């Protein structure tokens, strides 16, 4: 079931599946909720899965102004209130969704039971990443999601191995870029990517069991960086998925669901 829920960052599309304790899924920038398609069925066998489509993506609105990770985290709280969820949730976030999860788990700690971040760099963009993003935004403004822009984004989000063996994943990323409203997508990238703060200082304040997952081919969030981040979290741990980059749940769904289940089993006494 998918419904639109009004939040401080616009009306957001929210899909609910399954029964049991609530797990919240929030996707990466540039793709929409379909990027969870390969893991959602499995997770919904033991959780009530609430999949949020972020502003400027899919069917969700754009608020018409810049917005922050904290506002996205507050929007998640609004969604949970609207759905009548009052127990702590298991948060799973891919890139952007992981950033929001870190903020949610520190700003609204009683509402979060566990946190899984997938391909989520904790630091702000470096100069090279910022310059590349500014160029892509300028080109997108002039030309829209033309071939070289789709290729540029795909080459960052998906590993070389995924691009070679998985044309469906490549097509999904491209389709998400084509379907997204142009101005709304750019607003999301500026708000969340270019304006993203360094979240390192929040890590020691994470009081919930936290798993940092990254792909072996993720240039912006290396295994070494993910391990270092996990050591700053009181109940932090780290895992690396071979042959993946940013979009771990799309690139390696079986490994993703296995990691999440094992993490929940170790972290939640009453699992599943």
Residue ranges and their predicted role:
Residues 10-65:
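Conserved HGGG/HGGXW glycine-rich cap/lid loop of the alpha/beta-hydrolase fold
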Residues 41, 50-92, 258:
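Active-site loop/oxyanion-hole signature of alpha/beta-hydrolase fold enzymes
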Residues 93, 97, 101:
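Gly/Ala-rich beta-loop-alpha elbow adjacent to hydrolase catalytic centers
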Residues 106-107, 112-143:
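Flexible "cap/lid" loop of the alpha/beta hydrolase fold
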Residues 126-130, 146-204:
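Conserved alpha/beta-hydrolase catalytic His-Asp/Glu region
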Residues 206, 212-214:
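Short beta-strand/loop motif that positions the catalytic acidic residue
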Residues 219-225:
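Conserved alpha/beta-hydrolase "acid-adjacent" motif
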Residues 235-272:
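Catalytic active-site module of serine/aspartate enzymes centered on a nucleophile-bearing elbow/loop
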């Amino acid at each position: 079931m998918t419904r639109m829920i009004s939040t401080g960052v616009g009306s957001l599309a929210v899909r609910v599946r399954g029964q049991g304790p609530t797990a919240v899924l929030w996707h990466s920038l540039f793709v929409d909720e379909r990027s969870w398609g390969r893991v959602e069925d499995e997770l919904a066998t033991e959780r009530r899965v609430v999949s949020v489509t972020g502003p400027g993506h899919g069917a969700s609105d754009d608020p018409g102004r810049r917005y922050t990770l904290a506002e996205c985290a507050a929007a998640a709280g609004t969604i949970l209130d609207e759905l009548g969820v009052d127990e702590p949730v298991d948060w799973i976030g891919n890139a952007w969704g992981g950033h929001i999860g870190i903020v949610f788990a520190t700003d609204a700690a009683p509402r979060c039971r566990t946190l899984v971040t997938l391909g989520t760099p904790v630091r702000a963009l470096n100069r090279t990443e910022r310059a590349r993003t500014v160029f892509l935004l300028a080109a997108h403004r002039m030309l829209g999601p033309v071939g070289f822009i789709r290729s540029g984004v795909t080459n960052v989000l998906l590993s070389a191995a995924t691009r070679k063996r998985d044309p469906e994943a490549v097509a999904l990323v491209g389709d998400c870029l084509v379907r997204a409203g142009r101005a709304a997508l750019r607003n999301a990238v500026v708000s969340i990517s270019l304006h993203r703060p360094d979240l390192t200082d929040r890590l020691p304040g994470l009081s919930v069991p936290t798993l940092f997952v990254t792909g072996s081919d993720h240039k912006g969030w290396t295994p070494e960086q993910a391990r270092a981040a996990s050591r700053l979290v009181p109940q932090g741990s780290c895992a690396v998925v071979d042959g993946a980059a940013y979009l771990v749940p799309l690139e390696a769904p079986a490994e993703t669901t296995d990691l999440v289940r094992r993490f929940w089993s170790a972290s939640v006494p009453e699992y599943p």
